[in-house]
Amino acid sequence: MRRLSSILLGLLIFFVSCQKNKHEIGKPAIDQDQLLNGITTDTFDLITYTINEDSAITDNMANVLLGSYVDPKFGKVSAEFYTEFRLKSLNPVFGDVGTIVYDSCVLALQYVGYYGDLSAQNFEVYELNDSLSMDTVYYDFSTKPVKPGNLVVNGMGTITPKPLTNTVVNGDTLAPQLRIPLDTNFAKGILEESTSGNGTFASNVNFQTFFKGFKVKVNNPSQVIGKGGIFYFNINNNAASKLTIYYTQSGVKKSYDIVMNSLAADFVHIDTDQSGTPLEMVLQDSTKGQSTFYAQAFRQRAVIKIPGLDNLPKNVVIHRADLTLPVQFQNGYRYKPGSAVSVAARLKTSDTRLSNLNVVGAFVDSKKHFAIDLRTYAQALVADNIDNTGVVVSPVFFRNSAERIVFNGPNTINKMKPKLILTYTTY
């Protein structure tokens, strides 16, 4: 797996989910002398299971997702995206388009990361038959109709992604790109439109009425369990991600770019098939989550309830509340648990939405667990500021990645079990 950059982590940590409210519970100061004399207990019973996420907003995210993989625990996951294009400049001059020889047409997408392996996938591109809008909210289940016919050059859609290898274009070495070759007849139609007299290239509104954009997807019906990956591309703020028409005119090699940027609408569509998987069994019977429970970007969140926190006396000061969540992962396995998780809760039993607790649990690779500081959460429970509805844990890039996590439950057959260690004093 290739994680998103640390810079992107900083930017995205505030956008963990479209359905979380931010809530500052409060941060009582730690008195080190009291900490040394405090009472420590780790005998809390935990109730663990998995819940489904109804939907996630996916329009104009920091990166789009593309690809598929088949996970032995989660089933098949597929990601595709829809995007508009914009003119790089208005009223371009192509001269006599009748003299143009169309050499190639390439959709270039610059990688910013990936999840899974680098086996070959079959990529397809379709022209949209309906416009996108920056004013519309799009979800992971949203779709748009397309025109018939895959635009990828016949026989050239099967591509082995190389997100770790620089791309060379016309002798220039560039950051890694996925380059999808498209039918030059499509390119011809774009440039010939400049002579139509319709003013297509006079404004982006006119151009987007003529060319509404692309749906970019994969088609991997024979992908087997444990194979595949989903790739992350920056199309909103990256000049390298674009559609380029390469042509020759009067013996001179030329090119014309049509761009994607933050002013062009886009969204990601996600499909999952959990049929017959261990995840499906936990979703159907939450008690099975006591052995193993799960979290998956866009789709599922992990729940940890700690009923024993209700039994704490009201005259306690919580000094530490360390929740550790061991995961099932072996070094070298392609589907890693990610670098961090976000933590949320329903602050009142009547709440229908999650509130972000402003807590990020880091993955401790040497111990194969996530470490989560629940001190402020536990103190808020003691003070009766919130209800004990449990905490909800998700991949920190819930709307920007394909990450998934397999957690050990309290009844796991594995050695490491989830545990809350609480240190407190009374007054």
Which role does the model predict for each range below?
Residues 2-8, 12-427:
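Secreted, disulfide-rich extracellular signaling modules
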